Structures are given as C-alpha cells and as structure tokens.
Design a protein with these regions (language model features):
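Cys/His-rich short segments
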Residues: 241-310
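Active-site environment of divalent metal-dependent phosphoester hydrolases
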Residues: 12-14, 40-49, 80, 101, ...
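Active-site neighborhood of phospho(di)ester-bond hydrolases with catalytic His/Asp-centered motifs
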Residues: 5-7, 38-43, 72-75, 144-147, ...
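Histidine/acidic-residue-rich catalytic or RNA/ligand-binding cores of hydrolases
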Residues: 15-18, 49-53, 154-161, 192, ...
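Extended substrate/RNA-proximal surfaces in nucleic-acid metabolism proteins
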Residues: 2, 50-178
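Functional cores that coordinate and move charged inorganic groups
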Residues: 164, 168-171, 180-254, 258-262
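An N-terminally biased module of ancient metal coordination in phosphate/nucleic-acid-related enzymes
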Residues: 1-87, 377-379, 390-394
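Low-complexity, acidic/Ser/Thr- and charged residue-rich accessory regions of DNA metabolism proteins
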Residues: 319, 324-395
C-alpha cells in the first residue's frame, strides 16, 4: 500500500495566494492531479478554520475527508527571531492529529503575540527550537518539518537568514524533527551530500499558492493513509519515491541579481565574487551554491536511505509549449482537463501514459514533449534571485 501526498499548500487566506483556494476546489484539483492526501493548510486562520471544521469529516485516525479526498490538519509557520547575533527567519510545516490540538496551537500562538486574523501563514516571535518544544507540549503527536530548507530568506539552511546545520537551529529538539522539505530549487540528490541532514527523511511538496500548482512536487509514502502511518513514514523514511520539479526551474537555483539580469554558477561566483558586476550590490546566493557550501565529500547520506525520485515538467506547461500559448490561456486549460479526465489524472499522464494514448488524446506534439521530459531531454534556463527558470523539451 502507498499514498501520494502534497503537504505544503495554502488557502485563500494566506498572503499572495489565489482566492480560488477553497476546500471544494482543492479537493476537485486533487482528483484531477491524482493526489490522495492534502494538507488542510493555514489552520491557524479563524475563518479558514471554521470552514475546515464545518467541511472536513473524520476519516482514518487523525485524517479527514472532503468529497472523497483525504486531508491532514497542517499549516506553515514563519519563525522570526535573533540567534547567534543574526536575524533568523525559518518556515516550518506543522501537522496536528486533530482539532483539539489545533485549538491548543492557536491559543499558544496568540499568547506569543502572533496575529492570526491576517496571514494564513502567521509570523511567530519564537525560535524554531522553542516553537517545536511548545508544539510537542500541546500534543506529542504534532509533527514539525522545516519547509523549503534552502530558500535564501525563509529556509532553515538558507544563505540569508538560515543556519549551517540542523542542530544549530533546533538544538535539543533536533531528534524530534523527522524530515526536511527540499523546496523547488533543490532535488533529493542535491541534499544527499549534506552531512547536516543525515538521518532525516527527505520529502518534497508543492508549496502551491494557486490550484494549478498543486502537486508540482509530491511524496509517495508507503503504508495506509492514516495519521500514524504518515508519522511513521516521516520518521522511518518510508518513502516510495518523490515527484520533483526540475530544480533549475526553481526561482532561487542559481546565484544572481534579477534587476540587472545577472546569474552565476557556483564556479563563476567563486571566480567573480558575490557582488553584482553591474551595480555592485550583493548577489542573492543560489541554492546550488549554498548546497555546495554545506556539502562535504565523504560525509554524504547512507545510500540505503536514498529514495528514487522523478523529475517532471507540469502538464500545463507542456501544453502551453506545444500549443504555443500562455499557460493561462482558456484553450490550454480546456485541453489540460480533457486529457487528465481521459487518461486518469496528471501524474498518470506524465509518468505512465503510453505514447499512443498521449498522441491520441493530446496530439503528436504532446506525446513527444512528455516522452522527452521523461528521458531528461530538456533545455533549461535556470532561475535566480526570485525569477523562475524555464524547462522545455529539447529540439
């Protein structure tokens, strides 16, 4: 048994997120994508919590369901604090076993001064270590997973406000952190060489701020779809595989300065320095550079702990490419839903559908595009300094 999960999502009550992120729409898109388990997202927001309480029905122990899709109570918290003489900003994914724990978490956050009526991703004036301890005091079944750990400003290991090691961030709570999220700008292999992550399960989720971006990264867990199975899956690395963005498409993959159009590989950064050659301002160090700083030859993860992963380009992007239209064009959206309906969901289309079926339903151009991406035959312009990269089928 296994289940496919996207556990980093947001509701319409999180800043810079689509107003279409309703419970009904999220469930509908999960079916289109082929996702079996979603995070409820943003459970600290009072209006969204009321919608979750009314709409979600108890399912397997610790899980809930809405229109046939399973949900786990989850949210993202932004810890902003000072430690070691530096300002820190670390985003954490938090999961709770039930609504009683959620209410306890909200009460605790309010006591720390967090404004829960605003952003669905509230800011918390506590260290990642202290917040983890407080969460476990509320319910020992709560789980904490550092989010997009390499993002420069908001990642646990980010170049701007992060740390150099897991235990620097979490101290005596490190043993209670079962897993880390790769983020869009890194893939599992990039994380395998980082000694600071040894013994931690590597997971990938979408961090979707809109419905079409749900499932752009996923983790397939072994076991049944229950809260205990999820907890064991995270703690014991019971991951069957992850589905990945091409990390080069992430918006912080390379070092650079977007305003001046400057991007650099790690080798170029070592040679040229960390200031923009055009304006002299500091460059935003990319994820691939930061990974290199923290990787140590001979201290990579146990190969037995490594799990398979598959890099894919979103179907909507492949359709936009083959149809020569923008990804938000109505005709692209109609084609997307028709193909997913006929072939059994986006994940199936991208990973399993045969060439003949792809050609029959989507045309020769789509069949060729999907096949090339599966074979790794792509043309890439890497992202940098907040600008997404592009991935296109080669040729």
């Amino acid at each position: 048994m296994s289940f496919t999960a996207d556990l980093h999502l947001h509701s319409r009550y999180a800043y810079a997120c689509s107003i279409n992120l309703t419970l009904a729409n999220m469930a509908a898109w999960a079916k289109v994508k082929g996702i079996e388990l979603l995070s409820s997202a943003d459970f600290t927001h009072p209006t969204w919590l009321a919608e979750l309480t009314e709409g979600l029905q108890p399912s397997e122990e610790g899980f809930f369901s809405f229109e046939g899709v399973k949900f786990v109570l989850g949210t993202e918290l932004s810890c902003v604090y000072k430690q070691g003489g530096r300002s820190r900003c670390v985003h954490l994914l938090v999961f709770a076993p039930g609504f009683e724990a959620v209410h306890g978490i909200r009460e605790m956050l309010a006591g720390l001064g967090s404004k829960l009526n605003g952003d669905g991703r509230p800011t918390v004036g506590a260290s990642a270590r202290d917040l983890t301890a407080r969460l476990l005091d509320i319910d020992e079944a709560c789980m904490v997973v550092p989010a997009h750990i390499w993002t420069p400003w908001y990642g646990m290991l980010g170049s701007k406000s992060g740390f150099d090691a897991l235990d620097e961030c979490f101290g005596d709570m490190t043993a209670h952190i079962p897993a880390v999220e790769t983020g869009l700008s890194s893939d599992p292999e990039m994380n395998w060489g980082v000694a600071a992550l040894a013994g931690k399960t590597i997971v990938s989720f979408s961090d979707a701020h809109s419905l079409p971006n749900m499932g752009r990264e996923l983790t397939v867990f072994q076991g049944d779809a229950g809260y205990r199975d999820l907890a064991v899956g995270l703690k014991e690395n019971r991951v069957e595989q992850t589905i990945e963005f091409f990390p080069e498409e992430g918006k912080y993959h390379l070092t650079g300065h977007r305003k001046c159009g400057i991007s650099q590989t790690p080798r170029e950064t070592v040679r040229s320095g960390t200031r923009c050659p055009e304006c002299g301002r500091p460059l935003t160090l990319g994820v691939v550079h930061r990974v290199g700083e923290l990787s140590q030859v001979g201290n990579s993860s146990d190969q037995r702990a490594r799990r398979p992963y598959t890099k894919l380009a979103p179907l909507i992007e492949l359709l936009a490419y083959t149809m020569r239209k923008g990804r938000t064009a109505k005709s692209v959206g109609l084609a997307y839903h028709r193909i997913c309906d006929e072939l059994g969901g986006e994940i199936t289309v991208l990973t399993q559908a045969g060439y003949d079926d792809l050609e029959r339903v989507g045309g020769e151009g789509l069949a060729l595009a999907v096949t090339k991406v599966r074979d790794g035959k792509v043309e890439i312009v890497p992202g940098f300094d907040g600008q997404y990269g592009t991935v296109r089928p080669a040729g």
